[in-house]
């Protein structure tokens, strides 16, 4: 709607300037008063100017005049913001996440992601039972993109029939002939355990079938962590890619399982370029309530981070979804947090809420996505039968990054 886009742009741009430039990292919002003056169109280049109009040295409150103009000099918004400036210089490493969403010039986020991993050599991937056109096509397209060297594990006759149906060439593709999907899952896992492949990819078999083979004690792929799934998402309305976890593997995780879910997500975020990811532990409310287990778990997980039991990220929770992704919503509710409004990772209470959240973002919110399983000795490319080609290829690119990371830091 008219005005909504401009309001979102205003909040995002002002927050970016305040948090990175003037006053810089550590700045806390107090209030803002902005007037929307013009419209924003796709492809516009906006310039924000901020100037200190007053400051109180006793309270460190600073008032800044703000103006935003388009490339044509048209005023988009103007007004004032009041903040509490940091009392000492804070430096944080600038990070650049691989984009996975189309930009205004028509370049797809997948193209950005492929460029981001172009310097990495492809990895051998066991593709378990790719006996339908989408899964077989995705494996071969990922090969063509230079991401993987697929080893197809399934009934040779069915694989060749699917290839013929889709006009795909299997002449130079390795095939391990097994009789059925259950054997395909076991053989794919065995290839990974033997070091013959560096990742697994789900084909047309059921997720439970592959995961059961993966986590079997006899398989040899388990680590000290519990396996969990991460959706890497990017929506038009949020300024950075983010992770939703766990929406596919752990149905009703307990406290220790949630800790592993967070550890896995932090590792993924760091691999894709976020040095210290901000982790929002979601619940329906942002206060701790004895009658809501999700809020108790969130509080305990934050204390675990305080005690060094979870490292590598900044944790806060419980946070309602709006407080986790909207600085304005967090400010209205009086939440002072380094995570609120700018989360890199959203930790959901259970699989049902996470799955619904992720799929709402994908199918109704226009989110681009990738899906990966962590916590085993090799990454697992785990996508849904309804996922797009771009989602499958993006998931392979994420697995490529993880596999190269595991060469240096085995899980």
Per-segment meaning from a language model:
Residues 1-27, 31, 90-95:
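Hot-dog-fold acyl-thioester-processing enzymes
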Residues 30, 35-36, 42:
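Short, conserved secondary-structure segments in the cores of folded domains
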Residues 30-31, 65, 279-282:
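Beta-strand segments within the central parallel beta-sheet cores of soluble alpha/beta enzyme folds
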Residues 38, 52, 68-70, 80-85, ...:
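Short, structured patches in soluble enzyme cores that scaffold and shape functional sites
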Residues 42-103:
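HotDog/MaoC-like acyl-thioester-processing domains
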Residues 103-151, 155-339, 344-411:
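Anion-binding alpha/beta catalytic cores of soluble intermediary-metabolism enzymes, centered on
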